[in-house]
C-alpha cells in the first residue's frame, strides 16, 4: 500500500483544493515544488524552505545517480538524510533529462543509452534502473520512466512515443512492486498536443494503476493555447481522487491558468533560475533588477511582501549593485523572494478555492498586472 493519501477538500469550477498526506508530512494543494536538482535548492537552506512555505520539494534522479552516486546517498539513509530535508520529496525518473541530451542518446525498447554529461561515459537507463535508483533515494513520490515526446512532432511520432511510454509504464509498475517500495508511484500522461493520444495514454495508465498522474511532454515549446487544450481535455477524464501534476510548467500565469483547469501540483526552476539572473516576481509583474531605472530605487522588491529580502529592507538599488558585482547575496535574496512569491501565490489560490472565490482571484491577478483576462472555455466545468 502506498504511503500517500490524497484528500480532495473543495472545488471551484475545475480548480481543486486538496491535501497530500505522508508519514513525513502533509502537502496542501495546489502546491508548488521548489527544484533541488542536485539535492539542494540553490542558495536556500532546508529550514528556510519551510519558512517560505514549501512543503514538498523535487529531486532529480538522473543527476543524483551520476553525482554523487547511489552509494553516498545510501550511506545517509536516502535523500532526506543526505540533504537534511524532513518533508516529502518527489523524484523525477530521469526521462526528461535523457530527452534533453538530444544527439548524445540512443532510445531502444529496453531503455536509453547515453553519454553522461559529467565524464562522457556510456550509461544505460531503463524503467527497472530508474525504479531501483528511486528506491535508494527513498523519495515519497516516484515517477515512472517515460519518453518525453518532442515538440513539434507528427501524430505518428507522438503515437509511437506514447505507446513506448505505456510499455515502460507497465515495466516501471512491475519493478516498483518487485522492490516492495511503499512510495507513491505516479504515471505520466504523454501524447504531445494530440488530445486523442493523451486520452489513450491515460486509459492505458489507468489500466495499470497509479497513485497519481503526471502530465508530461509540455513546457517543451508548445504554445499556451495548445497546452490549455490538453489540460481542458484531461480534466474530466483523470480520476478525481488522484492528484494531477503538471511537470516543468512554472510561469505565474501558467500556474493560475493550470489550476483553473484542474492541476494540483507543479515544479519549475523558474523562480530560482530567474533570481540568479536578476528577475524578481511580484504581484504587478517582473522586476528586472539590471535595468538602469533601479540604480537609485530605495524601495524593496515588492512593498508589503513578507519575504526575508523585502522585510529585511534590502532595496532594489542595493540588489542591483550586488547583481552587477556578481555577489552571491543577490542570488540568495532574489531566490528567497521568488520562492516566497510562488508559495504565497499557491496559498492564495488555495484560500480562494476554499472560499469559492477563485475566479474573482483570477480576475484580480491579471488586473494587477495590467493584462487582459484570458478566456476560460465553458467546458469540463473550467469556467466560473
Curated annotation (Swiss-Prot):
GO CC, one annotated term: cytosol
InterPro entries in the record: ArchSynthase1/Queuine_TRR, TGT, TGT-like_sf, tRNA_ribo_trans-like
GO annotation terms (biological process): queuosine biosynthetic process; tRNA wobble guanine modification; tRNA-guanine transglycosylation
Cofactor binding notes: Binds 1 zinc ion per subunit.
Keywords of the record: Glycosyltransferase, Metal-binding, Queuosine biosynthesis, Transferase, tRNA processing, Zinc
Pfam families attached to this UniProt entry: TGT
UniProt-annotated catalytic positions: 92 (proton acceptor), 267 (nucleophile)
Pathway of action: tRNA modification; tRNA-queuosine biosynthesis
Entries under Gene3D superfamilies matching the protein: Queuine tRNA-ribosyltransferase-like
RNA binding, as annotated region: 248-254, 272-276
Binding site for substrate: 92-96, 146, 190, 217
GO molecular function, one term: tRNA-guanosine(34) queuine transglycosylase activity
Binding site for Zn(2+): 305, 307, 310, 337
EC number: 2.4.2.29
Subunit and partners: Homodimer. Within each dimer, one monomer is responsible for RNA recognition and catalysis, while the other monomer binds to the replacement base PreQ1.
Family label: Belongs to the queuine tRNA-ribosyltransferase family.
Name of the protein in its database record: Queuine tRNA-ribosyltransferase
Source species: Xylella fastidiosa (strain 9a5c)
Protein encoded by which gene: tgt
